[in-house]
Amino acid sequence: MANPQRAGRLAQEVQRDVTDLLLKRINDPRVKEVTVTSVELSGDLQIATIYYSILSDLASDAKKTQAGLEAASGLIRKELGSRLTVYKTPELKFVRDTSVQYGNHIEDLIRKLHTEN
């Protein structure tokens, strides 16, 4: 089990670097509208779960984005390996963060309640 402060620092570095790589290095149009919301590392720092959000609510766009991220994960991991100061670069696992859509849904419900009253 890694030191929690070290894991947190490394997660922040991974988030910053992945965001930078998606903006500047990855030319796949499927991943242009991706926002990295957070990164969680496993206890042994071997797996980085990268949570992302997209602006579109369409299921087809979500699938395309997931496929684009998985296709780019090898290049992203290689670039992370040269940027991070760790013995082994963590494996990357991309997961869509649906909290933004959930928050928008809750806001819509509250707005409807206010307009009804």
From Swiss-Prot:
Q: Where in the cell is it found?
A: Cytoplasm
Name the Gene3D superfamilies on file: 3.30.300.20
Q: Write down the InterPro entries for this protein, in alphabetical order.
A: KH_dom-like_a/b (IPR015946), RbfA (IPR000238), RbfA_dom_sf (IPR023799), Ribosome-bd_factorA_CS (IPR020053)
Q: Name one GO molecular function term.
A: ribosomal small subunit binding
Offer one example of a GO biological process linked to this entry.
maturation of SSU-rRNA
Keywords attached to this Swiss-Prot or TrEMBL record, sorted alphabetically, are: Cytoplasm, Ribosome biogenesis
Pfam families, per the entry? RBFA
Q: Name one GO cellular component term.
A: cytosol
How it assembles, according to the record, is: Monomer. Binds 30S ribosomal subunits, but not 50S ribosomal subunits or 70S ribosomes.
Summarize the protein's role: One of several proteins that assist in the late maturation steps of the functional core of the 30S ribosomal subunit. Associates with free 30S ribosomal subunits (but not with 30S subunits that are part of 70S ribosomes or polysomes). Required for efficient processing of 16S rRNA. May interact with the 5'-terminal helix region of 16S rRNA.
Q: Which family does it belong to?
A: Belongs to the RbfA family.
Q: Which HAMAP family match?
A: RbfA (MF_00003)
Kindly provide the name given to this protein in its UniProt entry.
Ribosome-binding factor A
Gene from which the chain derives: rbfA
